[in-house]
UniProtKB/Swiss-Prot annotation:
The gene is CRYL1. This is Lambda-crystallin homolog. The modification Phosphoserine is found at residues 3, 111. Its main location: cytoplasm. It is an enzyme of class 1 (oxidoreductase). Has high L-gulonate 3-dehydrogenase activity. It also exhibits low dehydrogenase activity toward L-3-hydroxybutyrate (HBA) and L-threonate. It comes from Pongo abelii (Sumatran orangutan). It catalyses: L-gulonate + NAD(+) = 3-dehydro-L-gulonate + NADH + H(+). NAD(+) binds at residues 16-17, 36, 97, 102. It comes from the Eukaryota.
Length: 319
């Protein structure tokens, strides 16, 4: 099967994100080499991937047109980084979120790759200008930040280094679409990229509302899961504005003054105090106790919900 693969992709790091990338690329027909410095880590990752893909097959949620065995045959482990990158068209780094560790990995890769392979990082917050600083192949470098869990949530943020070649962005965008993901282009780097800036803005105000006793933690979550989240699963905040009036200009004419009035009441960045954290944790634990067993079960339920939502979205999305 590997001989007829769409191309060779290397995953550096065999944790949760690395395994998810491996499954996604295999679903698109790519040969996948999973690299890790620990041979046992690779063995564990391959076994976890097999179990996960079997479960996906049973649930009817396996991505791609290939069978589970065909996809599994495309994924292999490699403990030697030089051997792993041989013949690769794309390298996806997935090591822990540590700038110096990632820079060390990219420096090593930079010294052994050719001028055609794309070097991509899964970082959620490290700036490309720092991550890829000093690399010879900087024009081939890009951040491709997935959303956890990547197999069920398709968005990928593409964030270039200031010297990244436009062709690198275009190739990465096309590759993400080929494996069924939904890439978006961040035009220039900014702390937190786009997704986390929006997420942190929500968390900041949510924390403040709970801390000031305006709403309970559980009711705060209801506002998202049964309110805003229902809309945002299908349309974003800007299209919501557009549809909630006779277009965007009409919305701004009607509501901009009211929005500014409310926004002026927002306070400073919360301190995320221990006292409030304990209050929120107590409320959360009433729903999901924070022991490994209950957390794992809730994550599995979340992933099943996301799978079903993805199926629904594929059925109702406008052409």
């Amino acid at each position: 099967m590997a001989s007829s693969a769409a191309g060779c992709v290397v995953i550096v790091g065999s944790g949760v994100i690395g395994r998810s990338w491996a499954m996604l690329f295999a679903s698109g027909g790519f040969q996948v080499k999973l690299y890790d410095i620990e041979q046992q880590q690779i063995r564990n990752a391959l076994e976890n991937i097999r179990k996960e893909m079997k479960l996906l097959e049973q649930a009817g949620s396996l991505k791609g047109s290939l069978s589970v065995e065909e996809q599994l045959s495309l994924i292999s482990g490699c403990p030697n980084i030089q051997e792993a990158v041989e013949g690769a068209m794309h390298i996806q780094e997935c090591v822990p979120e540590d700038l110096e560790l990632k820079k060390k990995i990219f420096a090593q890769l930079d010294s052994i790759i050719d001028d055609r392979v794309i070097l991509s990082s899964s970082t959620s917050c490290l700036m490309p200008s720092k991550l890829f600083a000093g690399l010879v192949h900087v024009k081939q470098c890009i951040v491709a930040h997935p959303v956890n869990p990547p197999y069920y949530i398709p968005l990928v943020e593409l964030v270039p280094h200031p010297e990244t070649a436009p062709t690198t962005v275009d190739r990465t965008h096309a590759l993400m679409k080929k494996i069924g993901q939904c890439p978006m282009r961040v035009q220039k780097e900014v702390a937190g990229f786009v997704l986390n800036r929006l997420q942190y803005a929500i968390i900041s105000e949510a924390w403040r509302l709970v801390e000031e006793g305006i709403v309970s933690p559980s009711d705060l979550d209801l506002v998202m899961s049964e309110g805003l989240g229902m809309r945002y699963a299908f349309i974003g905040p800007l299209e919501t504005m557009h549809l909630n009036a006779e277009g965007m200009l009409s919305y701004c004419d009607r509501y901009s003054e009211g929005m500014k009035h409310v926004l002026k009441t927002f306070g400073p960045i919360p301190e995320f105090s221990r006292a409030t954290a304990e209050k929120v944790n107590q409320d959360m634990c009433m729903k999901v106790p924070d022991d490994p067993e209950h957390l794992a079960a809730r994550r599995q339920w979340r992933d099943e919900c996301l799978m079903r939502l993805a199926k629904l979205k594929s059925q109702v999305q406008p052409q």
